[in-house]
């Protein structure tokens, strides 16, 4: 039986917290900042947690995380 492969695209985007939840960056935070308010840009700096519905599928891609 060959080894399972980690999905590298997912591995670059998610980190596992100490409690086992997955942490992710927020969307819409790479460019076009002139159109965003200061408050919106400040919220984009904070990481978010993956929702429970998505967590199981992402963990299947991150076999060894």
Curated annotation (Swiss-Prot):
The keyword Ribosomal protein applies. Keywords: Ribonucleoprotein, Ribosomal protein. GO terms for cellular component: cytosolic large ribosomal subunit. Residues 1-27 are annotated as: Disordered. Coiled coil: none annotated. SUPFAM superfamilies: L35p-like. GO terms for molecular function: structural constituent of ribosome. The keyword Cell inner membrane does not apply. One of its GO terms (biological process) is translation. Belongs to the bacterial ribosomal protein bL35 family. PANTHER family: 54S RIBOSOMAL PROTEIN BL35M, LARGE RIBOSOMAL SUBUNIT PROTEIN BL35M. This is Large ribosomal subunit protein bL35. It comes from Brevibacillus brevis (strain 47 / JCM 6285 / NBRC 100599). The lineage of its organism: Bacteria, Bacillati, Bacillota, Bacilli, Bacillales. The gene is rpmI.
